[in-house]
Regions:
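Bacterial signal peptide processing site
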Residues: 23-26
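Surface-exposed loop/edge segments in extracytoplasmic proteins
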Residues: 97-104, 140-141
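Short, compositionally biased P/S/T/A/G/V-rich stretches that sit at domain boundaries
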Residues: 31-71
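Short edge beta-strand/loop segments characteristic of extracellular beta-sandwich folds
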Residues: 73-80
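Short, exposed beta-strand-loop hairpins at the edges of beta-sheets
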Residues: 121-148
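Conserved aromatic beta-strand anchor motif in extracellular beta-sandwich/beta-rich domains
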Residues: 90-94, 134
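Sec-dependent bacterial lipoprotein signal peptides
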Residues: 1-21
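Short proline/glycine- and polar residue-rich coil/turn motifs
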Residues: 106-113
Length: 149
């Protein structure tokens, strides 16, 4: 006995097989969330702390997420597993996405390190919500929210 399949039947069977195989597949990407740190090529941002002053080792002296309009706002970025010269960029944005400051530093390969960024505005920051986004070698690696009250 011979079974004869039409072109439409073969197409339907192929489509069914493809859809069946895809149903159990999960994406390996996890979207980044505000206030998180992440890994990108060339290392990892493991922590962002923000506050009004720094210690000698570039850690924050008293972390906070709430600032006065005339405060200098410091960020201490902890990186891990950097194996080549790595570029860190800090982008500070105001609540509507307006970039208020952006600066870049190159760090030497050290495995783990702390890097400091800061912003100030002597005549005062507008009150509202701000976000610090840190980029590692051009890729978004972490964000931190803060507020000026």
């Amino acid at each position: 006995m011979h079974i004869r399949l039409s072109g439409t039947s073969i197409l339907a069977l192929t489509l069914a097989a493809v859809l069946s195989a895809a149903c159990g597949t999960k994406s390996s990407e996890t979207p980044g969330a505000t206030g998180t740190a992440g890994t990108v090529a060339g290392g990892r941002v493991s922590q962002i702390d923000i506050g009004r002053s720094l210690n000698a080792d570039k850690t924050i002296n008293g972390t906070t997420g709430s600032f006065k309009p005339t405060d200098t706002i410091y960020a201490s970025i902890a990186t891990e597993n950097t194996t080549a010269p790595t570029t860190l960029k800090a982008r500070w944005t105001y609540q509507d996405g307006q970039v208020v400051n952006e600066s870049t530093q190159t760090i030497a390969p050290a495995g783990g390190a702390r890097t400091e960024f800061h912003i100030s505005k002597p005549n005062g920051w507008p009150t509202g919500k701000y976000t610090l986004e840190v980029f590692l070698n051009g890729a978004s690696a972490a964000t931190k929210d803060l507020e000026v009250e």
